C-alpha cells in the first residue's frame, strides 16, 4: 500500500505549539535590517519610483543572456549518456530583458534573505509533493553548511549542549564550538542513531551540574555522514516522539536524501500522479513529513544532486523560525546565490525539466551511483575483505562506505584492564599507524577519530598542531577520547563516487597495504 501524506490531511494539525523559548539570546536581540524593511514595503507599492536603493542599475550589468546547455531527458538513461559524452542536449536560457522564469534583472540585484519567490515557490511545490508539511515556509540558503551554522546561532546560547550522533560530520559540529555550544553524543549502531540512548541521556540529565538540558538535535538521517547509515522509519517515529516528550528542535540535515538505491518506481503512480509523487512514495519518510508541532527544521541542498560549487539549498521551517532565519541572513550573507537561483528557476520551470523531469534526472543519478557502489563493494570483497581484516556494510543511500578494521586479529592488538575494571586498548595508535601507512602508499581514507564526538568539547582556548591520531576538537586543542568511544574508532570513511579507475586502483592499494599491516 502506498501512503501519501496530503496537504489536506496535514492541515488538520497546524503548528500551535509555542516554540519561541528555543530562540537564542542573539536571535531575540537581533533587529531587522532597516533598509531591507523599507525595500519590502516599497515592493508592494506598484509604480513607486525607487531613489533610495544602493545597488547598481540593471542597465549597467555586463550581461544580457545566459544559455545553460543541459542533458535532454528524452533518452532512456540521461546520466549515462551525459557521462559518456553522447547525450542529447537542451538549451535553457535566462535573459535580462526578455521573458523567462527569472529575469537576470532580478536574479543579479540585491534581494531578501529568504531568496526569490520564483525559486522558493517551485521548491515549496517540491516539498508539498514529497513531504506535505503543514504551514511551512521555504527559505533559500548558500547550501547546508550556511543554513546549519545559522541555525546554531538561531537556537544556541553559550553553555548550551546540543545532541548529535556519536560519529558525525565534524566540520559542522566544530562550527558551533566558538558559539559556546557543546555536543552530547548519542550512541549509534548500523541502523543509525539509537532512540533509547537519546531518551536515556535526556532522562538522566542533571541541570544543576550539566547546565540546560539539550533542546536541539542535529542529525543526518539519510546516508549519515560518516557512517552511511539510514534511519529506518520506526526509529524516525520514535525519535520524533522523544523530541516531543522533551521539547527538542530537530535539525534535519539531509543533503543525501535524493540519493537512495534500489528504489522501484511504480509506473501506475507515475501515470496517475506524476513522477515526483511516484518517487516520493518509495523515498524514506522525513522528519518533516511527520512533524505535528513545527519543531523540525529541514535542510536540503543541490550540492549532491546538481553541483556543490553552485552553493544553493533550501530550508523548510515553521513560519516563526523562518522569519528569524531570514532576518539573520538579511544582516549577514544578504541573500542566496543569484546565478544559482537563475539556473534553478529555469531548470525547474516550465521551459526546463520541470519538477517531474528533475526527479527523473535524480533517479537516473541514483542508478549511476548505485552502479559505482556495487562496483566498490565487489572490488572491496575481492581486494580488501578476502582475509577478514576489514568489513563493510552495503550503504542504502548517499556516497559513503563505513569500513571496519578488525584490529582484534592484529598481532600487536592489546587489551589491558584499568584500575576501575574497564578495558583499554591500543586501537587509536594502531589506526593512526594504518592511516599513515595508507597515506604513504598513495591512498587517503578519513579515520573515524576525525568524526568522533567526545561529549566534552569546549570553546577554543588556544591553537596547537592538529594530530589525526586522536579526536580533534576542531579548534586546535587536542581532546582525550572517552573510553567508550576510544575503543570504537577502528573505522575509515571511504567514498564510492569516483571513477571506476579510482575505485579499483584505490581498493587495490588498500588491500595490499592492510595485508602488509596485519602481517607485520
From Swiss-Prot:
Enzyme nomenclature, EC number? 2.6.1.5
Family as reported in the entry's similarity comment: Belongs to the class-I pyridoxal-phosphate-dependent aminotransferase family.
Its UniProt pathway annotation is: Secondary metabolite biosynthesis
InterPro entries linked to this entry? Aminotransferase_I/II_large, Class-I_PLP-dep_aminotransf, PyrdxlP-dep_Trfase, PyrdxlP-dep_Trfase_major
Q: What is the protein named?
A: L-tyrosine:2-oxoglutarate aminotransferase amt1
What molecular function does GO assign, one term? L-tyrosine-2-oxoglutarate transaminase activity
Any GO BP annotation: biosynthetic process
Its needed co-factors are: pyridoxal 5'-phosphate
Amino acid at each position: 500500500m502506498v501512503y501519501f501524506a496530503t496537504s489536506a490531511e496535514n492541515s488538520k494539525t497546524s503548528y500551535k505549539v509555542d516554540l519561541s523559548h528555543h530562540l537564542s539570546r542573539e536571535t531575540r536581540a537581533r533587529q531587522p535590517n532597516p533598509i531591507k524593511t523599507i525595500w519590502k514595503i516599497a515592493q508592494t507599492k506598484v509604480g513607486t519610483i525607487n531613489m533610495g536603493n544602493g545597488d547598481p542599475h540593471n542597465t549597467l550589468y555586463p550581461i544580457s543572456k545566459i544559455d545553460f546547455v543541459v542533458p535532454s531527458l528524452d533518452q532512456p538513461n540521461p546520466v549515462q549518456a551525459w557521462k559518456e559524452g553522447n547525450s542529447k542536449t537542451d538549451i535553457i536560457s535566462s535573459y535580462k530583458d526578455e521573458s523567462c522564469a527569472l529575469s537576470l534583472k532580478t536574479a543579479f540585484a540585491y534581494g531578501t534573505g529568504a531568496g526569490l519567490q520564483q525559486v522558493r515557490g517551485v521548491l515549496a511545490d517540491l516539498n508539498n509533493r514529497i513531504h506535505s508539511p503543514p504551514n511551512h515556509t521555504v527559505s533559500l540558503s548558500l547550501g547546508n553548511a550556511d543554513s546549519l551554522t545559522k541555525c546554531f546561532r538561531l537556537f544556541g546560547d553559550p553553555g548550551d549542549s546540543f545532541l548529535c550522533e556519536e560519529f558525525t560530520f565534524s566540520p559542522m559540529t566544530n562550527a558551533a564550538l566558538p558559539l559556546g555550544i557543546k555536543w552530547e553524543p548519542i550512541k549509534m549502531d548500523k541502523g543509525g542513531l539509537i532512540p533509547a540512548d537519546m531518551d536515556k541521556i535526556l532522562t538522566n540529565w542533571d541541570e544543576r551540574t550539566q547546565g540546560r538540558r539539550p533542546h536541539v538535535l542535529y542529525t543526518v538521517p539519510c546516508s549519515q555522514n560518516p557512517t552511511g547509515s539510514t534511519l529506518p522509519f520506526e526509529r524516525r517515529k520514535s525519535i520524533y516522539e522523544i523530541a516531543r516528550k522533551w521539547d527538542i528542535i530537530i535539525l534535519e540535515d539531509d543533503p543525501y536524501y535524493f540519493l537512495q538505491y534500489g528504489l522501484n518506481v511504480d509506473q501506475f503512480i507515475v501515470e496517475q500522479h506524476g513522477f515526483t509523487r511516484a518517487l516520493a512514495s518509495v523515498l524514506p519518510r522525513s522528519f518533516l513529513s511527520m512533524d505535528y508541532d513545527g519543531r523540525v527544521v529541514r535542510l536540503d541542498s543541490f550540492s549532491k544532486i546538481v553541483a556543490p560549487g553552485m552553493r544553493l539549498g533550501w530550508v523548510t521551517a515553521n513560519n516563526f523560525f523562518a522569519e528569524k532565519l531570514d532576518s539573520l541572513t538579511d544582516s549577514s550573507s544578504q541573500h542566496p546565490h543569484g546565478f544559482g537561483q537563475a539556473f534553478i528557476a529555469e531548470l525547474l520551470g516550465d521551459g526546463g525539466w520541470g519538477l517531474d523531469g528533475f526527479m527523473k534526472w535524480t533517479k537516473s543519478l541514483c542508478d549511476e551511483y548505485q552502479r559505482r557502489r556495487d562496483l566498490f563493494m565487489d572490488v572491496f570483497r575481492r581486494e580488501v575483505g578476502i582475509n577478514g581484516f576489514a568489513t563493510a556494510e552495503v550503504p542504502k543511500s548517499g556516497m559513503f562506505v563505513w569500513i571496519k578494521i578488525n584490529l582484534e586479529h592484529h598481532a600487536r592488538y592489546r587489551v589491558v584492564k584499568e584500575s576501575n575494571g574497564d578495558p583499554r586498548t591500543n586501537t587509536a595508535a594502531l589506526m593512526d599507524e594504518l592511516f599513515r601507512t595508507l597515506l604513504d602508499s598513495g591512498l587517503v581514507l578519513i579515520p573515524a577519530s576525525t568524526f568522533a564526538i567526545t561529549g566534552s568539547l569546549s570553546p577554543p582556548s588556544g591553537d596547537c598542531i592538529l594530530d589525526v591520531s586522536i579526536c580533534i576538537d576542531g579548534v586546535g586543542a587536542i581532546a582525550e577520547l572517552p573510553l567508550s568511544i576510544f575503543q570504537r574508532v577502528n573505522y575509515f570513511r571511504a567514498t564510492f563516487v569516483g571513477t571506476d579507475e579510482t575505485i579499483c586502483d584505490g581498493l587495490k592499494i588498500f588491500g595490499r597495504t592492510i595485508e602488509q599491516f596485519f602481517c607485520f
